[in-house]
Amino acid sequence: MNTEATQDHQEANTTGARLRHAREQLGLSQQAVAERLCLKVSTVRDIEDDKAPADLASTFLRGYIRSYARLVHIPEEELLPMMAKQAPIRAAKVAPMQSFSLGKRRKKRDGWLMSFTWLVLFVVIGLSGAWWWQDHKAQQEEISTMADQSSAELNGGDANSQNVPLDTSAPVDSGTDSAANSAPTDTASTPTTSAPAQTPADNNAVVAPSQANVDTAGTAPTTPATPASPLPTDQANVTTPAASAQDLVMNFSADCWLEVSDATGKKLFSGLQRKGGNLNLSGQAPYKLKIGAPAAVQIQFLGKPVDLSRFIRTNQVARLTLNAEQSPAQ
């Protein structure tokens, strides 16, 4: 009898036995307790049998026991000594901080490396942009200088062309009129003097038309027959030279500044050509060309077109040399 009483007392001192006894006094089943505590029936059964589930942490088990005790009106102070035996608190294992510090140092090193990479990238982009801007600015300044130079040359050429007719028109017209008026009278009165007068006319064939007319007007009183013969002689000599095999032909589809010189260094042309204009230049090959707008000009050399596409694609001033023996070179 004493042994059975001792066993009953020991069982009553366990957490599960106290909870089961209180539940039975309230007339609750394990299913009802599980529903109220939102637990599985197996979990309630393990708590009453003083079993600790392997997949349940001790912290959660102690919380379930407290909830069960409040449900069946058992003070928690009575169960604390029993819970310490059934669900002892295990010391948490603190992982060393070495891995975190290593990761932090690695992250910091990666951040510095990424910052340096971005810095190098920005420097490269900045240098590339500065180089492009300087090159573009130099090309624009060169084109502007070429345009100013061509404008100055055109203005000077216009001034010279306006002054020449004013100086030579009066004597030429007067000489021509006097020679025309005196020619019929002189030829009728002295027919024998016209033959020897052809010799000075032949000698004066290389003189410009204006100079020939002035000279004949001055010598009309002494040799009346001379004015009639130089006129057809000078007109026969003023002819357009025949096209040479070394000719350089250029047609312009837009306004373009250019400069052309031959092998002797002589500038065959330097200035601005307007849209629709054309040039036919002759000189000693090779020719050196500098073209401000390559897209606005079409060039033929030795009867073959010259390819300027490489300058048109890059939108640069074209500098090239045209040789008679080889293809055009930049």
Swiss-Prot record:
Cytoplasmic compartment spans: 1-111
GO terms (BP aspect): regulation of cell shape
Biased-composition ranges, Low complexity, are: 176-202, 216-233
Q: Which GO terms describe its molecular function?
A: DNA binding
**Name recorded for this polypeptide:** Cytoskeleton protein RodZ
Q: Which organism is it from?
A: Klebsiella pneumoniae (strain 342)
Q: Which residues cross the membrane?
A: 112-132
| Classification via InterPro entries | Bact_Cytoskel_RodZ, Cro/C1-type_HTH, Lambda_DNA-bd_dom_sf, RodZ, RodZ-like_C
